Amino acid sequence: MVERDNELKGTTFTISVLHISDGKPERIRQLLAAKVAQAPQFFNCAPLVINVERLTDIPDFEQLKELVESEDFVLVGITGAQSEAMKTAAKAAGLAVMASGKSRKAEPQPQPEPAPTPAPIVEVKAVPAPLVASKVHVGPVRSGQQLYAAGTSLVVLGSVSPGAEVIADDSIHIYGTLRGRAIAGAKGNPQARIYCQQLQAELLSIAGTFQLSDALPAGLIQQPVHVRLDNEQLRIDRIK
């Protein structure tokens, strides 16, 4: 039997960030509980990072950690710490101190290189990739029901009820009303899309980037829409 060495590799995850302006536990608990109530399965044991850049005083990170875990999230770290003392307190509570995703150092501009000598043109015949048929569900998806299209798209010829969940590794097409949760690009495909004839969703998610019902544009509720990722944010357009 061949033994494989342990490896340390870099990768990218989408993690929810909770921005707090004070350390009052009850307000934070109410916010997290409200989000979980909207999509309990989606947020169950979900990793969470707290942005503390608005805080002037050092919060009780041990208390915050217990509070977050009591609402079925997993607190993995903080971001936006303004002082070394705050970073030290977070580390003492077993939390990671993470840099803000928006701040990046300017990268040096590459110097132009001489144009390479053109390589000889070799004709390569394209080999078509094997097609994976979409998973088609005929009829409504009822509350508490979950459909998953592994490695392909999902087509629903009916409506998705509140409390129901439709998931696909590729795109989701709903020929009816979407009242439940739609999770496209479940394995990280940013090109996945969501289509529905009437939008009333509890949650929309593409490749880990999500939007809850309270953040949906009012003008697009009960409208036919097309959802896609645009610059790492969900963009919802009306289908004309």
Curated annotation (Swiss-Prot):
Family per similarity comment: Belongs to the MinC family.
* Pfam families assigned: MinC_C, MinC_N
Superkingdom in the source lineage: Bacteria
Whichever gene encodes this chain, its name is minC
Q: Which PANTHER family match?
A: SEPTUM SITE-DETERMINING PROTEIN MINC
What GO terms describe the biological role, i.e. biological process, of this protein? cell morphogenesis; division septum assembly; regulation of cell division; regulation of cell septum assembly
What name does the UniProt record give this protein? Probable septum site-determining protein MinC
Primary role: Cell division inhibitor that blocks the formation of polar Z ring septums. Rapidly oscillates between the poles of the cell to destabilize FtsZ filaments that have formed before they mature into polar Z rings. Prevents FtsZ polymerization.
| Assigned keywords, A-Z | Cell cycle, Cell division, Septation
Its assembly, as annotated, is: Interacts with MinD and FtsZ.
| Tagged with keyword Cell cycle | yes
